[in-house]
Amino acid sequence: RMRRLTRYRYNNSPLDMDGHRIYIKDGETVWNPGWQPTKTPLDSYSCRHGLGYTILEGKKDGVTARQELFVPKGDACELDRVTVCNGSTVVKELDLFSYVEFCLWDAVDDSSNFQRNYSTGEVEVEGSVIYHKTEYRERRNHYAVFWANCPVDSFDTTRDAFCGVYGGPADPQAVRAGHCSGSIAHGWAPVGALHIHLTLAPGESHSILFGLGYIENPQQEKFIAPGI
């Protein structure tokens, strides 16, 4: 409860909209390997759960996207390997987005104490890494990190910028536009959104590894640089 990384709405309404989401934009068509949250009809779909892992695989218009999620034993992180394959006879220009919405740590307080919570969100971006460090400076010794193992073309860290002020994960504004806006969260609802453009020849595939991790430092070692 006190160290939740991603936001969860406890009444689960709307149903099954939260989580680590992968979006594929192929021309004007936007879809997810796991169908949710865009609910775009897929040509084929499978979901497999094993001991410590889940594999989602969807196919749309000749493109197959496979999402493999697991938590390594002994490590405080989730790894998400996404493999996109062009099974069509034409070159595909695709935009891939990986998205999570951060919880402000206390899972119960996160959905109730709005007069305070909406002023605490804080992030830092370095290359392909988004650090969620809400309250790290003030009173916490832990933070979260969301990253990709390759250069990204754009990013967002505010929900309003990625989803749109009146939008949501079912039809994100940034995905429809084909790129993120480079937003930096200062309060409100911090998120992690990473965008990568792919050009795939017929028969070509490409894999990207995304990670979501939790890091905790000893309280006395929070700041180790001189003068900080």
Regions found by a protein language model. Give the residues of each.
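Anionic coordination/interaction segments
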Residues: R1-I228
